């Protein structure tokens, strides 16, 4: 963590689902708090496990359980357990998955406590669904908006589609709140991500 601080990092992101699923880490995170456990004094954001569902398939986790765990660990920014909509998902199925994600965001908004809330924007490759998701999320008290479900586009170098997804999402978002691009960790993408806002 010292090296991160020396490089100028001001905050870090880790994964609450992975911590939760490891009994030793789970116990330590609740007992000590996430900041002490990781040895990091700055802001900590946790993801909810949604990406693991993309990588491994179905995950065994309830949205309210992982939200509560993020609060118990004392994270600064917790993330809603959204539904990862794959880019190839057809419109009807993507719409159903988006409805579930929106329901979870609304429930988390009511139960976030003092924790800042990240409300992921989903919708697959369907630009109208992305805009709809962003507009609905902006009507909640969520504190920031990660654009999710885009890692496959990055991995396949589909940068035009990535830009279309981001711009369609951003058109519906409240411009006074920050936007995060989930999965954008490769330096090659940083300039594009900054350009997209």
Model-derived regions: residue spans:
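Non-catalytic, usually N-terminal nucleic-acid engagement modules in DNA/RNA processing proteins
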Residues: 1-113
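Glycine-rich phosphate/ribose-binding loops and adjacent secondary-structure elements
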Residues: 99, 111-197
